[in-house]
Amino acid sequence: MTDSPRETAAETATLLLHGARLTDGRTVDVRLSGPRIEAVGTAGSLAAGTPSGAADGTRIDLRGYLLLPAPAEPHAHLDQALTAGGPPAGDVEDVQRRATEGALLQLGHGATAVRSHVRIGDVQGLRSLEAVLQARQALRGLVDVHTVALPRLLTGSAGADGAAMLRDALKMGAAAVGGCPDLDPDPSGYTETVLSMAAEFGVPVDLHTAADDPARLARLAAMAGGMRPGVTLGPCHGLGALPATAVATAAARLAAAGISVAALPQGGCCVLDRRGTAPVRALRSAGVRVTAGSGALGDLTNPVGRGDPLEAAFLLASHGECRPPRAYDLVSGEARAVIGLPEVRVEAGFPAELLAVRGESLAGVLSLAYSRIVIHRGRVVSRTSAVREYCDSATEAVLDLPRQSHREA
């Protein structure tokens, strides 16, 4: 058993997770104190309550559950979430409501942090960003929302207005600079403005690109190489349509520049049409940091988009891009790293950002992830319980249940 130093002198209520299985096969107790894991020991070795025993804590029985670092969502569009049913009202209240509901849906699946791109400029101005920032505030303590300002044009006659609005967005509280150079008449000029603004405010960059033009991608990598706190490109689906030699060259350039890639195995997003998926295996083989996100959440791009990180990991594993442990890491550890969040391990001293899923192995969890318990900052913030029942086979004859089809004699 290992213990971590207490973060404060004040005693806080604890949460004991009893009998959880870890991915290495161990069955353990995990005691949480505030936002961190306080202790991990063999099953039955830990007690709930404060370290001095002055107060009782809460105990949750996790026998039959696999305990994992919680996923994070690295590429969402909460301002466009849940719009597949028709044109949204688009006012601040409507966007805030949908953004809140979308973030809660993703939290229910296990994501305790969400990076959301938010469109600015054109008709909506900064209203959508204002709404998502309000949703972020309302969700504090449940899920962490990180916003990326997504301007449309940054060059030409409209460029000055776009750059001014991007600056205002960062002053409002946007946590990163985004955009789509592919849709601007001057992609290099667009990228230069984004990188300059990000450097001025000291924020990361997260750009949309199909990555289907090797020359353009090479220029982007050269411009953004080595920038801190980091540059992410996504969904890079066009890379998958390029010849293998071109993919290898592009991947090597991205790796050398320290640029991460956010793939969207579940579908596209509202900025770029989907034409395939980023070649995750080839990118990772070249040393590129890759994460996987959801993209569209019930919008016109993907009306059935669910925002489930475990589904993204399932698709990566089932398509042969990664084995299950690595696929899960792409939606958890790698996603957190891309967003700029601290690492999570089921070990003492690490953040208490956890997901418990009924199952015994990662492969089983990715296949049948029904019942889930989500823990954020040491507190259970969501619980999903699924019950499957089958009728007794003998009952079928008594009730004369119909068959699936009837054939004429």
Which residues does each PLM region occupy?
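His/Asp/Glu-enriched, well-ordered alpha-helical/loop segment
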Residues: 204, 228-229, 277-357
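Alpha-helical scaffold segments that flank or form the walls of functional sites
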Residues: 65-67, 71-73, 82-117, 122-140, ...
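Active-site microenvironment of metallo-dependent hydrolases
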Residues: 1-38, 46-50, 107, 314, ...
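Alpha-helix-loop-beta-strand connector modules within alpha/beta enzyme cores
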Residues: 126-148, 200-207, 226
